[in-house]
Amino acid sequence: GAGEVLCYDGMTGRYFKSSVEAIKKAQNEINHSLMHSGPESLSAFYGLIGLPATSMSDELGWNSNELMDITFSTTMSPEGEPCIAIDFARAPIPHYFRTY
């Protein structure tokens, strides 16, 4: 897509092409769902940004107690290419579908 740059997912160590705007849009969609529909998995977020789910990402997520909060920084790829690094201010949790 337009404006895509190399990005790095700190949670899984994967590189992908996206933009800050697209990642923020995905975060907003997840948080909207958390507030109106219920728990969301890390895999759902990865799907929105074009990354395949992992066995770990199916087991982790957020619920309405804690909204998803992405932090952005910069890093270098192993090839020396600058990229946007994403991480989570509040890490996704196991058993996220429980709200007690």
Annotate the PLM regions.
Residues 1-100:
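Long, helix-rich, hydrophobic modules that act as membrane-proximal anchors or helical bundle/coiled-coil regulators
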